[in-house]
Amino acid sequence: MKFLAVLLAAGMLAFLGAVICIIASVPLAASPARALPGGADNASVASGAAASPGPQRSLSALHGAGGSAGPPALPGAPAASAHPLPPGPLFSRFLCTPLAAACPSGAQQGDAAGAAPGEREELLLLQSTAEQLRQTALQQEARIRADQDTIRELTGKLGRCESGLPRGLQGAGPRRDTMADGPWDSPALILELEDAVRALRDRIDRLEQELPARVNLSAAPAPVSAVPTGLHSKMDQLEGQLLAQVLALEKERVALSHSSRRQRQEVEKELDVLQGRVAELEHGSSAYSPPDAFKISIPIRNNYMYARVRKALPELYAFTACMWLRSRSSGTGQGTPFSYSVPGQANEIVLLEAGHEPMELLINDKVAQLPLSLKDNGWHHICIAWTTRDGLWSAYQDGELQGSGENLAAWHPIKPHGILILGQEQDTLGGRFDATQAFVGDIAQFNLWDHALTPAQVLGIANCTAPLLGNVLPWEDKLVEAFGGATKAAFDVCKGRAKA
């Protein structure tokens, strides 16, 4: 901007000089000369001017008072002092010519004063010089106008840039180097404008990337000043709402997964029940009469012969399990008459005699030794009663109480939906049998109640005077299935025991 100001001042000065020179080159109108006191030189000049021809008079006036007095007087002419002539008109001409090498000097002008062709050449030179000055003035005027247009354009652009600055930059503290108090080319202001323009460009690019294509096609363009704040606030609100919805959906998904798992388990249980009923319908009535008149026989010790109870057990806080057993082991332990496992606990309920150890009752992996003996290879009635309150237990053999105790898995309820296996001990849910812990012999009348039977009830079952079926699991042909070579055969325990 300093350069533009200097250029404008120089142009104005050049224009004024050219106008002055053009005005000075125009001949002035003739006016009568005024008599100057004591002006002998003026009188001589006037007489010389009157006596000389027109062209010569003009040249004399060109040279001025300090020049030649004119041509000598003719012979016989009266003296100037004796007969003074009346004062004639005086002519003056002021010329402004450039001091160029082509311009004739004063001596050359004096030599060519009396020659008409020399004066004509001088006039032509002066006219060409005046025309050059006029063209120069016109060029300067056009350049000044162009500079003014440029200044207006730059001022307009600067105003638009100021209007596009952020509000914080528009009103932050005193402003320096403005139109009124300083140059516009200060480095600080230029850097500030560049930063503002760069910030605006970045925000515009970011908005173009974030706006969806459908909004760009359908929505009307909003003002640039209103887009960033309103759009960013709406985007922040939408982001918060979406995050809350995502978290809610995640919680619902977890809850649905848990509920679906429970529902799947319930459906599987119902399917098991339905399969049992279908199997009952397919098989028709029981092959044994009465339905509990059968036994399960496991002839040899192995890990693949067993019987499985089809009915699932509920949650139990007390139980009594009674059965008829005849062991055919050779003195190396009676094995496992029955085992009940649930998910996460393979030894929920186990009746086991391993090796030369006494018979044991395991509940939730807690052990109690039972004073029972089955080594005579005969039929024996065994009953085990337990309650979760204080972990009380009782063991009966052939209707008589053999032992009792407490603190066996106290306050632990028997978990439901497990698998009940006859003849094998389970290391996992429903499998991984160990041949050394298998039962060898016959099992009959396995019944299960959800409470502890009284000693009188146990005695009535053992001597066949008051037979009683389990209310949780009765001994029925349709509920017991043999696998791996174990066999089911008709057997009336009271008659068979009498015969044995």
Swiss-Prot record:
CDD domains: PTX (cd00152)
Disulphide bonds in the chain: 322-383
Gene Ontology annotations for the cellular component aspect, listed alphabetically: glutamatergic synapse; membrane
Cellular location(s): Membrane
Keyword Disulfide bond: yes
Cofactor(s) listed: Ca(2+)
Transmembrane segments: 3-23
Protein name: Neuronal pentraxin receptor
Protein species of origin: Homo sapiens (Human)
Gene coding for it: NPTXR
